[in-house]
Amino acid sequence: ENGLGELAYEAMNKRDYPSFGHWIDQGATTTWEQWNGENSRNHPMFGGSLTWFYRKLAGLNADPLQPGYRHIVFRPQPVSQIDWAKYATATPYGQASVDWSKRGGRFTMTVEVPVGCTATVCVPDAKAPSAVRTDGTGKKDGNIVYNGMKDDYAEYTVRSGKYTFTVE
């Protein structure tokens, strides 16, 4: 939320004690109650930070003003060390998904919005709306509306369908 994706990546990939990486090196397959492994070894105590992977890195969230995924917000926060992220979740209306990658100076993001839902799609590193190319099932029907630039993100509103956004 504060634009500290690089720091979050470093914290999630740390291998020395105390860290999630240290737990993995100790054979953990769940989050533990304490960093040192005492007490429960299947405990949600530190699990909240794991939401960074889908909420921030992949960037798929229910709009807090329209709960239940009636309106979805796609706003990935890529970090320099990761070239792609993919996430899907079941909603009351069907599957919502995001799949982004960056290769050779090109950023591509495909989003899927369930039937009967709308979404705000924020395309990172766009710098200008002319840098973004869109394609998808709803484009011909005028289902993509450009809302403007916000913090180096080109923001769009889309209706249900599958859309691909590319930044060259």
Provide a role label for each language-model segment.
Residues 1, 6-168:
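Non-catalytic C-terminal accessory modules of carbohydrate-active enzymes
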